[in-house]
UniProtKB/Swiss-Prot annotation:
Cited function: Interferes with one step of hemostasis (modulation of platelet aggregation, or coagulation cascade, for example).
Disulphide-bridged cysteine pairs: C25-C36, C53-C149, C125-C141
Signal peptide: 1-23
Molecular function via GO: toxin activity
Miscellaneous field: Shows greater sequence similarity to the alpha than beta subunits compared to other heterodimer snaclecs.
Expression tissues: Expressed by the venom gland.
Limits of the C-type lectin domain: 32-150
Species of the source: Sistrurus catenatus edwardsii (Desert massasauga)
Name of the protein described by the UniProt record: Snaclec 3
Secreted is among the record's keywords: yes
Keyword field contains Nucleotidyltransferase: no
Length: 151
């Protein structure tokens, strides 16, 4: 009997610790490597999308992408959740300054350590282009596009 109680308790602890990881994300968000992600189909310009992400979850911002594995996760999330026929999806990176130099920080303040550019910088905001396997492209910041938030 004591052994059954111990096994039951052990299974409960494992279940609660595993479910706690997913419970850290708001309802409807996906979890990857300790962060929460959610694509939004309602198109917004870059600034409005960033503000919206700030309001959605504690620590929320437009998505920062820090590795090729995270890029693959975000690409799959977009492919499964953003309407077909949409060309661009906002990410949390934009050109800062007069010289059109890319900011060295994402909108969440993290450093840019991974890059997936398809073209040289010419406009001020960046997004994923669905037709190029989610490579990063320059987009006019006032354009309205769906976006992905990360918290």
């Amino acid at each position: 009997m004591g052994r059954l109680v111990f096994v039951s308790f052990s299974l409960l602890v494992v279940f609660l610790s595993l479910s706690g990881t997913a419970a850290d994300c708001p309802s409807g968000w996906s979890s990857y490597e300790g962060h929460c992600y959610k694509p939004f189909n309602e198109p917004k310009n870059w600034d409005d999308a960033e503000r919206f992400c700030l309001e959605q979850a504690k620590g929320g911002h437009l998505v920062s992408i820090e590795s090729s594995e995270e890029a693959d996760f975000v690409a799959q999330l977009v492919a499964n959740n953003v309407r077909r026929g949409i060309s661009y999806i906002w990410i949390g990176l934009r050109v800062q300054g007069e010289e059109k130099q890319c900011s060295t920080k994402w909108s969440d303040g993290s450093s840019v350590n991974y890059e997936n550019w398809i073209e040289a910088l010419s406009k001020t905001c960046l997004g994923l282009e669905q037709d190029t396997n989610h490579k990063w492209v320059n987009i006019y910041c006032g354009e309205i596009n769906p976006f992905v938030c990360k918290a």
